[in-house]
């Protein structure tokens, strides 16, 4: 019977070992040994008189397989799973036609009134015509201001979305276009003169697009963010105080609504927006939608710790508790409005947290007590 050869046991070795043979598959199977290490060079060379010892058998053979790199191709845009077809909007047609009919009816009524006044007296007709012209001119100015406010709000939304894309794509040309438009947008604000000068000096430098957006955020938004935080904190404190001392629930609801509307308008004007009545309605709707998306007034651990850490959980009355909750709701509304009215997204600067505002609210409450 032939003797069974035991299997080779696994062993470890280094590729720098001179006894390891490396085989390159691209060279047609040609083999070469690794270069000896420093320790191998330190070995004494064989004497010239003696015969050279036979080379030891290789400990291992390693084949180097080189895989071909796949060609790099630009990624294709994913096809939209849902491709809604824009149909004819009958609702828009209805409201446009209804508005036109109401406008014509109002115009006919005004013209009929002026004709009747002229029939009664020349003086009354003249006064009626002047009043009608004043009313029409005032209405045109109001409509123009509303349209101007909506346009500025739309520009803020576009700047915010474009800056967010630049932070992802690092497009320098788009970043410079955004900065130039932002400088024109914030030009009326004298508080940002130093930041505008700094950006004008660095706008043509060799800077990545994302870094340029971050520079603009630090130079233009830092001071505005501090003022916005003060506005939100003061509004939350006022709501908390009035809710705690008001005798009627209806007064609480009205004051919270008025304070929230006023706060949103102040934040919009702080960041460069000039919303009118329609603009405020749009901002209120967007703020409520933003709150619904982000989870409403969800309290984090830091917020709960700030509330419980002041010992209020055991000694808060019902009205005082309502005041604190309404104050936190106002602060949450302010933070949501801050996200919507800010021309640049938060990236280089820290986003204000609800916990910090709640801590300020608790400190104010302790002073009042």
Curated annotation (Swiss-Prot):
Does Translocase count among this protein's keywords?
no
Source species of the chain:
Rhodopseudomonas palustris (strain ATCC BAA-98 / CGA009)
- Membrane-spanning residues: 90-110, 124-144, 239-259
Localization terms from the record:
Cell inner membrane
Q: Does the keyword Cell membrane apply?
A: yes
Start-end of Low complexity biased regions: 34-51
Q: How does it sit in the membrane?
A: Multi-pass membrane protein
Q: Which UniProt keywords apply?
A: Cell inner membrane, Cell membrane, Membrane, Transmembrane, Transmembrane helix
Similarity field: Belongs to the UPF0283 family.
Where is the segment annotated Disordered? 1-61
Q: What Pfam families does the annotation carry?
A: DUF697 (PF05128)
Q: What is this protein called?
A: UPF0283 membrane protein RPA1583
CC terms in the record's Gene Ontology section: plasma membrane
């Amino acid at each position: 019977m032939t003797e069974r050869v035991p299997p080779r046991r696994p062993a470890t070795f280094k590729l720098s070992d001179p006894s390891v043979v490396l085989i390159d598959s691209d060279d047609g199977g040609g083999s070469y040994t690794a270069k000896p290490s420093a320790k191998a060079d330190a070995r004494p060379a064989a004497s010239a008189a003696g015969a050279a010892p036979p080379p030891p058998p290789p400990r291992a053979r390693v084949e180097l397989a080189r895989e071909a790199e796949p060609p790099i191709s630009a990624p294709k845009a994913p096809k939209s799973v849902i491709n809604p077809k824009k149909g004819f909007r009958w609702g828009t047609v209805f409201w446009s036609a209804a508005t036109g009919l109401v406008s014509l009816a109002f115009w006919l009524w005004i013209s009929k009134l002026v004709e009747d006044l002229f029939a009664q007296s020349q003086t009354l007709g003249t006064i009626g015509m002047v009043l009608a012209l004043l009313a029409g001119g005032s209405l045109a100015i109001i409509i123009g201001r509303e349209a101007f406010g909506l346009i500025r709000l739309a520009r803020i939304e576009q700047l915010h979305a474009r800056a967010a894309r630049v932070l992802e794509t690092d497009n320098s040309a788009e970043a410079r276009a955004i900065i130039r438009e932002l400088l024109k947008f914030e030009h009326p604000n004298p508080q940002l003169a130093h930041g505008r000068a700094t950006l004008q000096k660095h706008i043509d430098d060799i800077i990545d697009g994302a870094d340029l957006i971050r520079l603009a955020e630090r130079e233009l938004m830092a001071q505005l963010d501090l003022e916005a935080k003060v506005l939100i904190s003061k509004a939350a404190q006022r709501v908390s105080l009035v809710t705690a001392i008001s005798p009627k629930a209806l007064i609480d609801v009205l004051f919270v609504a008025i304070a929230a509307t006023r706060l949103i308008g102040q934040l919009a004007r702080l960041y460069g927006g000039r919303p009118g009545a329609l603009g405020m309605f749009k901002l209120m709707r967007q703020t409520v939608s933003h709150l619904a998306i982000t989870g409403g007034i969800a309290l984090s651990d830091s917020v709960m710790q700030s509330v419980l850490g002041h010992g209020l959980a055991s000694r808060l009355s019902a009205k005082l508790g309502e005041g604190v909750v309404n104050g936190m709701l106002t602060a949450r509304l302010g933070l949501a409005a801050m996200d919507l009215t800010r021309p640049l997204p938060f990236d280089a600067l820290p986003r204000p947290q609800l916990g910090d505002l709640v801590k300020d609210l608790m400190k104010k409450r302790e002073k009042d007590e």
